[in-house]
Amino acid sequence: MARFIKLVAAALLATVSCVNAACGDGSPDATVTGDGGSFTASKGSSNVYSGSDYRAAIQAALDSISSGQRVAVIASGSIGANTITIDSGKIFEGCGAIDVGNRAGHGAIESLDTTGVQIPYLTMTGNPYFGLRFYGTKDLVLGEITMNLSGGLGIRFERDYAANSNVKMGTITVTGAGSHAVETWNIDGLTIDTVVARDVGECGLLLQTTTNANVGLVDGDNVAAGTGYATFRMANNNGQLASGEYTPNVFVDKVVSRGGGRGVFCVSQSGGAVISSVDLADNGNNAILLENCYNIVIEGGTVSGGGEVRISSRDEFPVSSDLSITLTVNDNTVHESPCATNMDWSISGDASMDIC
C-alpha cells in the first residue's frame, strides 16, 4: 500500500512539475506584478490591466489566456471579500501571498463545472468563507497549496451541485482554519499526497460521498479541539459504491494526529476503507471512533493516551460490520458497544479491553 501511494504521489508530482519547475519560472503566458496599490497584468508584451485593484488584475490576466496557458501571480496583495474564477484548461500559479476576505457562500478562488484546471502553486492568507471552492470538475490538479488562515474553510468540494471526477492534490498545508482544512463531497477518483492541518477548528481531511480515493498522509496537530470532528473523518456514505457495496476503494497510507479532538472518525454508513497505519496521541476525544461503518481495515499503528478506541452504532443505521483493527494501544481503553458484526480485533499494549 505504501509503495502504491508513493507511486501515485510520484505521478502527481510529475504532472505538476511538467507544468513548471517552480512558481513563476519559465515563460508564463500572463503575469501579475506590482505591489502596494499598483498592479499590472500583462500578456506577452501587452498590458491587460493596470491599476490599484489586485483582484481585477488577477482576473484580467486569467481572462486573457486560453485553455492550456498559464498565469503566474508574482505580486502579493488583497482581493478583499471577492472571488477569482478559473475557467477550463487554465493553469493558475499564486506565487505571491493572496490575502482574502469572507464572501458568504463563495470561494476566494473558484472553478465550477470545468475540465483540466491546474493550480500548481498557491499561497493564501486571510479569513475566507471557502479558500478554494469547486464543483463539477474533471481532471483538476492542485499542487503545493499553503493556506495560513485566521478562520474559514480551506478547500471545499460542494455537496448540492455537480459531481467531480479524477481530482489530484499534492501537498495541502492549512493552518488556522476555523472549519475544515479540506472537505470533499461527490468525487469519484481522488488522489492526495499529503494534507497537513495545524490549529484547525474542525477536520483536517473530511471525505464524504467520495469513492476510489488514494491518500498518502493526513497529519493533524490541534485539529478539532473541543469538537466531535477529527484529523481524518469519513462521513455520509463515503466509500459506498454505486452498487451499494463497500468493496475497499478508499486507501490511506497513514494518519498522524496530536491533541485536538478525534484522531480517526468514520460515521453515517461510510466504509470500504483501508488505513495502513495510524500514529495517534493525546486526542481530546476518541482516538478512533467507527460508528455505523462497514468494511473498514486499520492494518497497524499506535495509539497513546487520549480518548478511547471505540466501535459503536446508532439505532437509525445498520450496526457496524466487517471491521478489522490491528493496533498497539497504551494508556487508553478499547470499547465495543453495541457489538459489531464480524469484528476482528488484534490489540497489543496495556489498554484495558471492553469488547464483545
Name each region found by the language model.
Residues G89-A97, T115-G126, K138-L149, A163-G178, ...:
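Right-handed parallel beta-helix
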Residues G68-H106, M124-P128:
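N-terminal extracellular ligand-recognition/capping segment immediately after the signal peptide
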Residues D160, M234-Y246:
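Intrinsically disordered, low-complexity Ser/Thr- and acidic-rich flexible linkers and loops
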Residues M1-A21:
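Fungal secretory targeting signals
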Residues C23, S46-Y49, G220-D221, A225-T231, ...:
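Core solenoid repeat modules with strong leucine/isoleucine-rich periodicity
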Residues A21-A60:
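Right-handed parallel beta-helix/beta-solenoid
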